[in-house]
Curated annotation (Swiss-Prot):
Binding site for substrate: 31-36, 70
EC number, UniProt record: 1.5.1.3
The organism of origin for this protein: Saimiriine herpesvirus 2 (strain 488)
Official protein name in the record: Viral dihydrofolate reductase
Keywords, alphabetical: NADP, One-carbon metabolism, Oxidoreductase
Length: 213
């Protein structure tokens, strides 16, 4: 099964995403509503899975845990038991994605969202060839100690528009920001077989398209 992963994040001009486990900027209500809408919108009778590291989980105010109307999965190599309020615990992103194929989840999960922190974002960007990044671009700098990985435009394409994502610049509390969506570029390699067929192969996929040459 080829699984599409979605990372959603807000970054400042230096790709900073946090400071001491909290947002470096004041709460931006429209961005918060955007996060809620994107991560909860799902097809009927299914819910989205939100995957987060232990620190991200505990940075959420206890009264708001778990994130409602979503399946909450926490990643940790140290925790032995599922944190109170969470639904699942996995040691790694790879283990988490294997859980989705299990009977208890396979018919319940619609979309998969990675919501932090930095190392989990990095793992997702390295793991999947089918990946979208939903980036809230804060158009100023803040004091931060945690960063989002570099978005290499050799590997990612900035989409001109995307359904449900506002294209105009937002402003709240004197802070301007915009919503961006990036799609990971899947390279296709061509080679000719001895039978005279041209085969296009996409890395890490069991997908092959043949045509006569």
């Amino acid at each position: 099964m080829v699984l599409l992963l979605n990372c959603i994040v807000a970054v400042d001009q230096n790709m900073g995403i946090g400071k001491k486990g909290h947002l470096p900027w004041p709460l931006l209500i429209n961005d918060f509503k955007y996060f809620q809408r994107m991560t909860t919108s799902s097809v009927k009778n299914k819910q989205n899975l939100v995957i987060m590291g232990k620190n991200t989980w505990f940075s959420i105010p206890e009264k708001n845990r778990p994130l409602k109307d979503r399946i909450n999965l926490v990643l940790s190599k140290k925790l032995k038991e599922i944190p109170h309020g969470a639904h699942f615990l996995a040691r790694s992103l790879n283990d988490a994605l294997k859980l989705i194929e299990q009977p208890e989840l396979v018919n319940k999960v619609d979309r998969v969202w990675i919501i932090g922190g930095s190392s989990v974002y990095k793992d997702a960007m390295n793991y999947s060839s089918h990946l979208k990044l939903f980036v809230t671009r804060i158009m100023q700098s803040f004091e931060t100690d945690t960063f989002f990985p570099e978005i290499d435009l050799k590997n990612y394409k900035l989409l001109i528009e995307y359904p449900g994502v506002p294209s105009n610049t937002q402003e709240e509390k004197g802070i301007k920001y915009k919503f961006e969506v990036y799609e990971k570029i899947v390279n296709t390699f061509l080679f000719k077989s001895h039978a005279g067929l041209t085969c296009s192969v996409k890395p890490k996929e069991a997908s092959y398209d043949f045509e006569l040459s």
